[in-house]
């Protein structure tokens, strides 16, 4: 590869690193071209899957300001540059790796830090953003429906509830009859003295 071609390749890879929300790094030793094409299809729009020389990828990562991945760039390495939801891409790669033992997840990079294999697999085990938002909306809807039912209850139901509580309280501890207050004669007010 000519020097100008290498510089162009490094610039392209660096741009992919900068635009990606996450990167997933794999070893593809033993996979056929058909397997790689199948993996790319399974990633659909969530990521692009690229194979490049490790030296070029190391330079591109350095140019993009990404650190901590150099040890992952050894052997036949391919990178999934995730532009969509990281969970979807990680799920696709993890599923493919289970079906094709030749694909090995090496790690990744997301939110400014390197990810271990275990962290990439934990991301793959998460539910997608849409599912989590749907669950949150469902929980909120249920609570809002309960509150709306409470606020829409007729005033008569509230009055009956208050009366029932009052009767229950009266039955539990009968109120003592109030003692009549002892009457005391009222004193006549004193007349003011005239100073004449």
Curated annotation (Swiss-Prot):
For bias kind Low complexity, which ranges apply?
172-196
Instruction: Provide this UniProt record's keywords sorted from A to Z.
Output: Ribonucleoprotein, Ribosomal protein, RNA-binding, rRNA-binding
What one GO molecular function would you report for this record? large ribosomal subunit rRNA binding
Superkingdom of the source species: Bacteria
Q: Does the keyword Ribonucleoprotein apply?
A: yes
Similarity field = Belongs to the universal ribosomal protein uL10 family.
Q: What does this protein do?
A: Forms part of the ribosomal stalk, playing a central role in the interaction of the ribosome with GTP-bound translation factors.
- The name this protein carries in UniProt is Large ribosomal subunit protein uL10
Native source organism of the sequence:
Mycobacterium avium (strain 104)
